[in-house]
Structures are given as structure tokens and as C-alpha cells.
Amino acid sequence: MENYNDILEKMLNGEIKPYQLDKMFGSKIATEIRRKFIEKKVGIEFKHICNYSIDEEMAMKKNIENMIGAIQIPLGFAGPLKINGEYAKGEFYIPLATTEGALVASVNRGCSIITKCGGATVRVIDDKMTRAPCLKTKSVVDAIKVRDWIRENFERIKEVAESTTRHGKLIKIEPILIVGRNLYPRFVFKTGDAMGMNMVTIATEKACNFIEGELKKEGIFVKTVAVSGNACVDKKPSGMNLINGRGKSIVAEVFLTEKEVNKYLKTTSQAIAEVNRLKNYIGSAISNSMGFNAHYANIIGAIFLATGQDEAHIVEGSLGITMAEVEDDGLYFSVTLPDVPIGTVGGGTRVETQKECLEMLGCYGDNKALKFAEIVGAAVLAGELSLLGALAAGHLGKAHQELGR
């Protein structure tokens, strides 16, 4: 880097703000100067975050502010995993970015077992993105009038909302919750291959402005307090999303004969079903958890980081129910994930390393989101089967010990 000591001095003196460098220099130089600024501020020398291959200019336009470098997370793969989906058909290698030792090995074992047993059957049972603003009125009487007006004028609201986007389609506005004199209408959209949060926020905001204006003509006061009123529910664990779904809602299942359970998991169907009942149902219930599963978040998190999804949505992907049912001749095993917000275009999917991981799955770009969702569901199934099998067989501690974790 050239000598920019005068710029650094002005930054240290507060004369130049770090974000102002983007307009003064190109993206690469601005990033380097900010990095030097932090080094001087905290008294360390960066040796690793300065080494990366992603395009700073593109990242700074779309993904990050005050950029000083990039971090690296170890990337492995699990597979092949045979998937019998509606959109994902065949064998896939699953990219997993994680610093948790033994995770990839566990998912890989699950992939191997599922593939040997005929593959995972996967379906996306629902597909939507939601935004629920908070609307304030003068009384509960007015709140009811606003609720009824929204329902009666849905088609007009739909036209206004959809005028902001080429891809978003407003499907419904339900439920419309009333608390005191406030309303929380849940706008439900189809968003194509984008995860869609920005899309639905912009559309909902315009719809709210329309609602305010039209009701003002009728002498009813209504004010949008916040375009997101937390009934969406975005980036938080939620009973609303567990029941009603958000993003992609996915079910993945596999059937193993008793012989296959004995051979590959070194345990019995009955033992796995008991672990699932006492751990995932009873244990989750007494702790008031909404994740009736062993570790969906592990697989969701590793895939999200690898493929450029919004990492804050990992908490939503952690919701769901694992089923392990003993049949006469074996084990029916399934995972139900009601809330997986994902996309194959936009956001972090543009970042070069994340784009390559989506390409590894054949899932980058348009018309790929449902295929990607089925792959995610199958990968979670693999991770869940492997862990519950290890717990039932009493092998979990041994596995971590052998892998030196």
C-alpha cells in the first residue's frame, strides 16, 4: 500500500470517518486504509484477514460496509447423498462450512446410510416469505374497522404491493392480529428464487402507505409504527413460524429395514425411537424449546455459511420436528422443517466463494430455489439420522474422542 499516513492521521483525529474512504478511493485502497486504521486503534497487526479472493468492489456495493478484509471458515463436503425429490434428483455432494469438528463426518455418515437405503424422499410443502407491520389506530373499534377494510380490499392492496417488484406476488394477508388498538397484519408473498426479505419489506411498506391514505379518506386514523412488527417472524424462534411456516417448508424422509439399522447404525429401531421421544419431544417440551430435533441448526448453519444465505435465519431453520417411528420391518425416519428462508439469487449468493458452493449443487441462479430447498432438507435428514443413531448406540462421545475433538 502506498503511504497514506496523512489520511490515517485524519482518521485517528476524527476528521475523516472510515465510511468516507469509499468515496475518496477505490474499494481496494479504502479497505486497506481502514484495516491499517483498526491496526493502529487496537494495537495489532492483521496477517490473515487481508488474504482473500473475493471482489471488494462488488462486496462493498451489495454485502458489507466499512470492509477491512474477509474471514475464512473451513469448508468440507458430505456425500454423495441420493435424493428423490421433485426438483432435486440424483446424488449430491453437500458443501458444509464449519469450525465444529466431527460435524462433517457425522453428516457424511448419514449421507452414506441414506444412499445405501435407497435415498431420501423430499418435498417442499409450502413456499412463502412474510412481513407483518405494526399499525396503530385510536381504539379497538377502529382496529376492527381497519382489519375488515384490509380483508375487503385485498385485491387493491395486492396491486399496490406488487407494483414494487417483478417477482413478488402477494398471496394473502393473514392472520391479522389485534392487540389493544394495534394491528399486526401478516403479509404473505411468493418471492421466486430470492429469499425475498428486501422485496417483501419494500412491497409491504408501499401497501401500508396505501392503507393509511385510503382510510384517512374514510375518517379513520391509522399509522404504520414499524414496517416490521415482529409477527413476521424474522430472525427469531417463533411458534408462529413453527405452525404456519416461513420461507421454504420442507419434509424429508427415509425408510430403513431393521437389518439396515443394525448394520449401519449399530443399534435398533426401537432404541432410536426411544431417544427421539425422550430427547427431542420430552426434553424439548420441558425446556420450552421449539426445536423438537437433535441438531438441525448444525447442518442449516454449515450450509447457510457455505452458500451465502442470511446467517441470522439459522435460528429459524433450527425449528422443526424429527419423527422416528418403528414399523414391523424397520424404521420410518423424517424431518419436518417449517421455516427455511433461502434463495439462489441475490444477497450473499453473489459472493464468489458462496456462488461456487451453490454451483457445486447445481443450484445457482434462477429456477433453482426449490431444488436447493430439497437438498437442504435431505442434508438435515442425514445429520439428524446419524446423530440419533450415535446417541442410541452410545457412540457419540467415542466418535468425538476418536476424531480428537
UniProtKB/Swiss-Prot annotation:
Annotated GO MF terms: hydroxymethylglutaryl-CoA reductase (NADPH) activity
Superkingdom of origin organism: Archaea
Keywords per UniProt: Isoprene biosynthesis, NADP, Oxidoreductase
Biological process (GO), any one: isoprenoid biosynthetic process
Cross-referenced PROSITE patterns: HMG_COA_REDUCTASE_1 (PS00066), HMG_COA_REDUCTASE_2 (PS00318), HMG_COA_REDUCTASE_4 (PS50065)
Active site, UniProt feature: 100 (charge relay system), 310 (charge relay system), 400 (proton donor)
Enzyme class: oxidoreductase
Pfam family name, one: HMG-CoA_red
InterPro entries to which the protein is assigned, alphabetical: HMG_CoA_Rdtase, HMG_CoA_Rdtase_cat_sf, HMG_CoA_Rdtase_CS, HMG_CoA_Rdtase_eu_arc, HMG_CoA_Rdtase_NAD(P)-bd_sf, HMG_CoA_Rdtase_sub-bd_dom_sf
Gene3D superfamilies, sorted: 3-hydroxy-3-methylglutaryl-coenzyme A Reductase, Chain A, domain 2 (3.90.770.10), Hydroxymethylglutaryl-CoA reductase, class I/II, NAD/NADP-binding domain (3.30.70.420)
Record's keyword annotation contains Magnesium: no
Pathway stated in the Swiss-Prot or TrEMBL entry: Metabolic intermediate biosynthesis; (R)-mevalonate biosynthesis; (R)-mevalonate from acetyl-CoA: step 3/3
Reactions this protein catalyses: (R)-mevalonate + 2 NADP(+) + CoA = (3S)-3-hydroxy-3-methylglutaryl-CoA + 2 NADPH + 2 H(+)
UniProt-listed Enzyme Commission number(s): 1.1.1.34
Function: Converts HMG-CoA to mevalonate.
Assigned protein family: Belongs to the HMG-CoA reductase family.
Listed name of the protein: 3-hydroxy-3-methylglutaryl-coenzyme A reductase
Species whose genome carries this gene: Methanocaldococcus jannaschii (strain ATCC 43067 / DSM 2661 / JAL-1 / JCM 10045 / NBRC 100440) (Methanococcus jannaschii)
Taxonomic lineage: Archaea, Methanobacteriati, Methanobacteriota, Methanomada group, Methanococci
Gene: hmgA
